[in-house]
């Protein structure tokens, strides 16, 4: 009853009891790709940054294969590309309901590692494997709808944030 899946289900039930129609999440996962070798995670695959040219992006075929498999499994890949760190990559999927989005995150790590071995790559989801490179994160683009309206948006606010969005952010910070 204290597992993450149960906690998420409970949070969804609470949101519905407060009049929210749905919670959708679009996960965006960043990771580093390395050549497989004895001293793991030392050989960086590329030395260019964000959105490098395809001819220089030696892991693009890996990302494409991973994205194709994810789509075959029903996960709508929004995009994939090289990130700003050397050998850092990112895949984002389109918004899903909260529980399928959470399931995707677990599935993604498993399948990404499995496919990497076919390309003789190792990967890591460590937040900061190198002190001199960009850190990796897992961004969650979250939307909560009420009567079909995004409750996080307030066009009259200078930052476009509603009071609901501010409380939501505060809740994340308080419970992290």
Residues covered by each model-derived region:
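Glycine-rich, acidic/polar active-site loops that bind/position phosphate-bearing ligands
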Residues: 1-176
């Amino acid at each position: 009853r204290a597992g993450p899946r149960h906690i998420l289900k409970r949070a969804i039930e609470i949101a519905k009891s407060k009049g929210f129609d749905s919670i959708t999440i679009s996960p965006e996962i960043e990771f580093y790709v390395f050549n497989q070798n004895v001293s793991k995670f030392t050989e960086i695959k590329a030395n260019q940054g964000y959105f490098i040219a395809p001819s220089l992006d030696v892991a693009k075929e890996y990302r494409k294969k991973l994205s194709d498999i994810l789509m075959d499994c029903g996960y709508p890949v929004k995009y994939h590309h090289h990130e700003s760190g050397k050998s850092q990559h990112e895949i984002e999927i389109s918004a899903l309901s909260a529980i399928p989005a959470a399931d995707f995150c677990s599935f993604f790590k498993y399948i990404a590692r499995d496919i990497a071995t076919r390309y003789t790559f190792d990967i890591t989801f460590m937040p900061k494997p190198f002190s001199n490179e960009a850190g990796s994160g897992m961004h969650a683009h979250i939307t909560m709808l009420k009567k079909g309206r995004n409750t996080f948006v307030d066009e009259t606010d200078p930052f476009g944030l509603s009071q609901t969005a501010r409380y939501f952010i505060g809740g994340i910070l308080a419970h992290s």
